[in-house]
């Protein structure tokens, strides 16, 4: 038989983690003792990576909040005197979009030093033209550079702190721990490339 501690269940949110635990408990209550059910490992991707990295001493446990990323983006735009827009428009519209773009790119493990400026500008222009953008070629190329600069400035601003994407990337680089015989991923079709690598790394 399979030992409960050899089972790892992974979800994307804390809410889903609780729902999964409740479902397992309800379905298993009459078949297995509660003490065995409690030994099943149920985590979010981030909590699993965080626990391993802190227990192993790879990170201090300080997590960067969303406000730090937003402030870093705004600070970079202002330092470069980027974009001829009002501050309220930059703060309310552009910064959130840049923040989401950075998180999306990091979810694929792409760091700012891996981005080729000319190629990025080319791809941005192609994508923008396909959507009949109102922005000029010069504006699109300039914004691409400002985006990469903001991303780099954010990465440079961190010391011992990590954000949620860093956690997953660091886990992949550092994990030498135990593997699980059975790994169950809730909503597996929603995994990105980094999360898929984590599952492959921890599954026997």
Which residues make up each language-model segment?
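Short, mixed-charge, low-aromatic patches
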Residues: 26-31, 124-130, 183-193
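Coupling/switch/interface segments within P-loop NTPase motor domains and analogous charged loops
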Residues: 67-156
């Amino acid at each position: 038989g399979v030992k409960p501690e050899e089972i790892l269940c992974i979800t994307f949110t804390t809410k889903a983690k609780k729902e999964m635990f409740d479902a397992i408990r309800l379905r298993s209550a009459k078949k297995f003792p509660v003490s065995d059910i409690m030994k099943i490992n149920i985590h979010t991707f981030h909590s699993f990576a965080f626990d391993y990295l802190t227990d192993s001493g790879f990170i201090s446990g300080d997590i960067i909040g969303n406000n730090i990323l937003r402030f870093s983006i705004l600070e970079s735009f202002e330092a470069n005197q980027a974009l001829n827009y009002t501050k309220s428009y930059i703060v309310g519209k552009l910064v959130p979009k840049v923040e989401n773009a950075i998180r999306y790119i990091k979810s694929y493990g792409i760091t700012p030093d891996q981005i080729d400026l000319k190629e990025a500008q080319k791809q941005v222009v192609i994508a923008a033209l396909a959507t009949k953008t109102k922005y000029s070629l010069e504006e699109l190329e300039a914004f691409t550079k400002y985006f990469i600069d903001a991303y780099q400035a954010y990465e440079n601003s961190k010391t011992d702190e990590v954000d949620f994407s860093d956690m997953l990337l660091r886990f992949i680089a550092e994990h030498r721990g135990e593997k699980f015989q059975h790994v169950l991923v809730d909503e597996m079709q929603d995994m990105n490339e980094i999360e898929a690598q984590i599952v492959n790394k921890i599954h026997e």
